Amino acid sequence: EIAKEQYNTKNAKQESLNTEGKRILVVEDNDLNMEIITTLLEDYKIIVEPAYNGKEAVDKVKASPPGYYDLVFMDIMMPVMDGKEAAREIRKLPRKDCQELPIIAMSANAFDEDVKQSLESGMNGHLSKPIDMRKLEEVLSQI
């Protein structure tokens, strides 16, 4: 009974967020972390597109039509191009949607200075790893 009640509560929350069909670019170089966040987001009927480093993320945003992505979850420490540099590059793209696209840092580093640096690079917020479901839902409620 308790498990059933928790399941029903989870489903009600997912439906109330109205995220079905939203498209999120998840930028994460660690396969296990990518799998975890993808599974969490797919539970909300979100379309997840993966990128495995910052350069790949910038290239995907560049190649996409305006308004294609609803949100970007961006790891910070990655090879090739880190998340902060990728956020700066996305913000420089000459498209209005690239200035407005929500970019949320995902990082195990959650000190005030880390959050400040993420925001200074053009990101809109910061989620600490491991992902807190309440905070994830707060972010998802805004797309």
Which residue ranges define each predicted feature?
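Charged docking surfaces used in two-component/phosphorelay signaling
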Residues: E35-D43
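Helix N-cap/capping motif at the beta->alpha junctions
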Residues: D29, P50-K62, G83-A86
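C-terminal catalytic ATP-binding subdomain
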Residues: E1-K13, Y44, R134-I143
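A Lys-centered signature of the CheY-like receiver
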Residues: K129
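Receiver (REC) domain active-site loop signature in two-component systems and cognate sites
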Residues: M78-M81, M123
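Hydrophobic/aromatic residues positioned on beta-strands within the core alpha/beta folds
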Residues: I104-M106
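Active-site beta3 strand of CheY-like receiver
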Residues: G67-F73
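Disordered, acidic interdomain junction associated with two-component signaling
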Residues: E1-L25, R88-K96
